[in-house]
């Protein structure tokens, strides 16, 4: 038995599909992050608005200290503290990240949104081996076994061209060069195929 859609229904379905494609993956509206300091109020991010659609790349350009990192950390809810004042909207896949309960936000981190920090030593645990840091991230978000996670960790390190990945998983961050640590951070960020990836200062050494 076949199903025939009337002209009006077909038009509605087409409009809905087009609307879904046109919907921004990330919609930022009048985003502000101010810090209370001894000298008064520091306006690090002051009224930022933009749309980012799936598959697009957006570059935020500005001099050092202009608020680029604060902007991405605000969207990811990483600017914590009693002196931080945030307002506006950051809607990701229809959800306002700024109003999500932190329990839901922790599920978004790493799985749907990831960030590659400028200094990998701030994102890698210096006393935990590389392999464990990758496998714990993978197991938390993908629910795979230890054996599967280890195999995936090696594959991820190989994908970012880390030589002798099978050996590197047993190394500590300080035993790698800065460039290799950055590649590890990239591997972790890409592990769960996030829909949105922030890269802090991607063109620096």
What is the role of each PLM region?
Residues 191-195:
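A short, proline-enriched helix->beta-strand linker immediately N-terminal to the Walker B motif
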Residues 134, 186:
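Hydrophobic anchor residue at the start of the ABC signature
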Residues 84-96:
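Conserved ABC transporter NBD signature motif
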Residues 197-200:
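Catalytic Walker B motif of ABC-type/P-loop ATPase nucleotide-binding domains
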Residues 171-176, 180:
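Conserved ABC ATPase signature
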């Amino acid at each position: 038995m076949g199903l025939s859609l009337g002209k009006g229904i077909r038009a509605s379905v087409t409009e809905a599909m087009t609307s879904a494609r046109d919907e921004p993956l990330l919609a930022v509206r009048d985003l502000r992050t101010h810090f209370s300091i001894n000298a008064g109020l520091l306006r690090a991010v002051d009224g930022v608005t933009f749309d980012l659609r799936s598959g697009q790349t957006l570059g935020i350009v500005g001099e050092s200290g202009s608020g680029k990192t604060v902007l991405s950390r605000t969207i990811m809810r990483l600017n914590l503290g009693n002196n931080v004042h945030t307002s506006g909207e950051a809607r990701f896949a229809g959800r306002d990240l700024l109003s999500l309960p932190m329990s839901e936000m922790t599920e978004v981190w790493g799985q749907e949104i990831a960030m590659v920090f400028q200094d990998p030593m701030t994102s890698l645990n210096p006393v935990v081996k590389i392999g464990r840091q990758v496998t714990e991230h993978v197991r938390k978000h993908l629910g795979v076994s230890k054996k599967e996670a280890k195999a995936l960790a090696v594959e991820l390190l190989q994908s970012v061209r880390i030589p002798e990945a099978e050996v590197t998983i047993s190394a500590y961050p300080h035993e790698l060069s800065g460039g290799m640590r950055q590649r590890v951070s990239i591997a972790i960020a890409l592990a769960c195929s996030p829909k949105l990836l922030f890269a802090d200062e991607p063109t620096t050494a």
